[in-house]
Amino acid sequence: MTRTVYVNGDYLPETEAKVSIFDRGFLMADGVYEVTSVLDGKLIDFDGHAIRLERSLGELDMRNPITKEDLLEVHRELVRVNEINEGLIYLQITRGSDGDRDFAFPDPETTTPTIVMFTQNKPGMADSPASQKGAKVISIEDIRWGRRDIKTVQLLYPSMGKMMA
């Protein structure tokens, strides 16, 4: 079964999903993300994720392209059409693209943010060995930048840390 994803207002088969190569999220990690767990087909702490999303967007002076109510509806629809009982929904909003690569932020009045959402099915997530017994972790200095409170898509260093563990 092909997974259904959400891109800029449209529900699409994942094989048809496209984002511009000039999108600032791709070129500059200029975006934020949230991951909402799904257990027993229910969203876990959606309100907390929506609040943090709004705060992160505000800290980056990014426009939110979707209302909280519509965001909840998209989450529920993705859970329904993808038949997710245990898993997650990944959401990413980027500043979008106004054409060529540039360090200056594009005009928010003329540039539409990009929003992408997809599900991951994780059957047995709550009963996994890591959930039951824990997982090996290490502590490493976070050298990303001084604004770790903003949940950006800059995840290379945490990925490297996971590989070190």
Go through each PLM region and give its residues.
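Conserved alpha/beta cores of soluble small-molecule-handling proteins
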Residues: 1-165
